[in-house]
Amino acid sequence: MSKKLNDQELVRLDKLNRLIESKQNPYEVTKVANTHNTKSLKEKYDQFSKEQLAEMQLDKPITVSGRVILIRRTFILIQDFHSELQLYINKNKQPDLFKYFNDYLDLGDVVCATGKPMKTNTNELSLDLESLKIISKSLRVPPEKFHGIADEEIRSRKRYLDLVYNKESKERFVYRSKIIAAMRQYFNENGFLEVETPFLHAQIGGAAAKPFVTRYNALDRDYYLRIAPELPLKKLIVGSFEKIYEIGKCFRNEGMDSTHNPEFTSVETYVAYVDYIYMMELTEAIIKYIAKAIGISHTNIKNETIDWNKPFKRIKMTELVKQETGIDFTQVKKIDQALDLAKKHKVHVKEHEKTIGHIINLFFEEFCEKKLVEPTFVTHHPVEISPLSKLDYSDPRYTERFELFAFGKELANGFSELNDPIDQRQRFEKQLEEKQKGNDEASEMDEDFLEALENGLPPTGGLGIGVDRLVMMLTGTTSIRDILFFPHVREE
């Protein structure tokens, strides 16, 4: 061990050395012939009484393995992935085993236990030990309280300890896995094809965000970790695919807080020949399918509750702003009027945001977003903030776009995809103007994508769902750290 050891760690290291000297090196064990895990053992034998177990004759002893999380006199509590099991050493019948237990065993050790099922006087199913072998020695002292680690920083940095000693944490990650599996199952059952697109992009695109930059030595140029897979996926729709999805990592070189991590998981899906209304229906169907699949109907966060079975609400962004502020931005025709309203309501407007559309969005973010607790589709975003969305041709100030909000946070984003290459080029040019005015998140001109559009993108609906946010909302978790196995943390 590289660092200076404390007294307890020195004792543990001494025990390991004595095990090795006595030809009982735990690290020489390469496999274990377990007959049961803790769950299957309980399912099979917990139904029997103490007397029935005492009389029961087994064809062979039971073997189960797990980590020691509690030692109390002649009892040991072990834990595997499924649950916990008590082990019992009869020191009168097994003096050598009791000596081994006293000489070598510590909290945190991984052991292989063999014996016969029994029940204690308190009717707890236990394993009456015939043999016990340490198969991995814990040289570090585990947290003092086996029932949990309270320090959030330790839990994030040392997730392996958190998973061992916090049952709720492990359950959240099991839910995460089930949520992604259910999501994939929904798509596959409904005729979608799972695809993969590059993580390294030659140009920034697909979302408004700052990228991570890396050097591609073989090509002698900078590349970007993708901020979204949108543009490559739409190229596949041009290439005759009609129902596709991708679940994967995206990267945004921005701040960290309770709902943002620079590396995150999203799902994006694209369907040919449909519009944003179809994609809203699809979004709602996916989320309800997942909630049902994992057995969650309601979620409570900070005394606010969502019933996932209820229909999701829909409202235009301008209508919502009018409800909350009394301002009808559909009647605002001049930028000076919009700027005066922003000044009056103390809404800060940056140089690149001096358009009516940007100001509508700023009002929405300031006065509306946090109040959207129940799942709500906010629709018809201004064209200025939607460079990849098809226009609402009945009022081209707005687009056929929606965002889904719940618990005051964005959960999904979708729209009728802009498939007019001439309009798309003009939108990219507007983005370049914004970049010159200080918008670091503005898109670049993507000639390769424009060429794809010029070959003909059919009417298409697109959708992106933040998987991490979805896991948080379905499990009632307030910090994104708690649903990422290894969240990014600042150096100690």
UniProtKB/Swiss-Prot annotation:
Its EC number is 6.1.1.6. It comes from the Bacteria. Mg(2+) 1 binds at E403, E410. Binds 3 Mg(2+) ions per subunit. GO terms for biological process: lysyl-tRNA aminoacylation. Mg(2+) 2 binds at E410. GO terms for cellular component: cytosol. Keywords: Aminoacyl-tRNA synthetase, ATP-binding, Cytoplasm, Ligase, Magnesium, Metal-binding, Nucleotide-binding, Protein biosynthesis. GO terms for molecular function: ATP binding; lysine-tRNA ligase activity; magnesium ion binding; tRNA binding. Its cofactor is Mg(2+). InterPro entries: Aa-tRNA-synt_II, aa-tRNA-synth_II, aa-tRNA-synth_II/BPL/LPL, Lys-tRNA-ligase_II, Lys-tRNA-ligase_II_N, Lys-tRNA-synth_II_C, NA-bd_OB-fold, NA-bd_OB_tRNA. It catalyses: tRNA(Lys) + L-lysine + ATP = L-lysyl-tRNA(Lys) + AMP + diphosphate. It holds the Pfam family tRNA_anti-codon. It is found in: Cytoplasm. Belongs to the class-II aminoacyl-tRNA synthetase family. Homodimer. PANTHER family: LYSINE--TRNA LIGASE, CHLOROPLASTIC_MITOCHONDRIAL (PTHR42918:SF15), LYSYL-TRNA SYNTHETASE (PTHR42918). NCBIfam families: lysS_bact (TIGR00499), PRK00484.1 (NF001756). This is Lysine--tRNA ligase. It comes from Mycoplasmoides gallisepticum (strain R(low / passage 15 / clone 2)) (Mycoplasma gallisepticum).
